[in-house]
Amino acid sequence: MGLPFQIEYGQTTGRPELIEDALRQFSAALALTADAGGLYVHGYDESRNQRWANPASGKSPAIWARAVGWLAMALVDALVILPDDSATAELRERTRRLLAGIIARQTQAGLWMQVLDNQGLAGNYAETSASAMFAYALLRAARLGLLRGEEAKAALSAGRQALAALLETRLELDEQGVARLTGIVHVAGLGGFDGNYRDGTPDYYLTEPVVSDDAKGVGPLMMAYAESLLLAR
């Protein structure tokens, strides 16, 4: 999440080594967490000591939508401010494939599931914050030319559908008439926390509390809506 800021800092201060470092970090993270289905798992343990880590690959066992949402936003935010050259070519291709994979997993209702790659999992649900993150990443990638042609059209369609679904189904008025953004998973992680061990299985991600008005959902929704306004200019 911090790498787009590192890149901008490197650009502003004339320190290209910071940009090169950020690109290496992106590439390493993608290589270590890539899933056979074209998405990215939540975590990686080089030591393989954590119980959630696959003993062969070190990867966690499930694809959590919000983790992919953070990744998609970071990749898009970084690439739209970098030159389209050989230094970023591989990362751009990986990002295009990721965005295509996200579009392919959008539900008919326009949102995305908490466990992203398993819509049929019992108890799985459409999660607000990841859906807002994906809407932002798709709309921004299309608006600023990271995606072109049919890819851009598909991203615009998916992003607009997601934003409309969020505004129509996830904003609810409370008893005082205040609009609340609902359906946001509060937090999820891996390993020990607060006396519990988070094992990273698909079922684990369905046990975390779902809340309203968490900044991790409100912020991306505002960002996605801003992209829609910029596209309408």
Swiss-Prot record:
Q: Name one Pfam family in it.
A: Glyco_hydro_88
Which UniProt keywords are listed? Answer: Hydrolase
Q: Which InterPro entries match?
A: 6-hairpin_glycosidase_sf, 6hp_glycosidase-like_sf, Glyco_hydro_88, PolySaccharide_Degr_Enz
List the molecular function annotations (GO) for this entry. Answer: hydrolase activity
**GO:BP terms for this protein?**
carbohydrate metabolic process
Q: This protein's superkingdom?
A: Bacteria
Provide the disulphide bond pattern.
none
Q: What induces it?
A: By certain acidic polysaccharides found in carrot root extract. This induction may be regulated by the polygalacturonase.
Summarizing the function annotation, the protein's role is: Seems to regulate the surface properties of the bacterium in the presence of plant cells or plant cell extracts. Mutations in this protein are responsible for an increased aggregation of the bacteria in the presence of pea root cap cells.
In the record, the note on similarity to other proteins reads: Belongs to the glycosyl hydrolase 88 family.
Any idea what this protein is called? Answer: Protein Atu3128
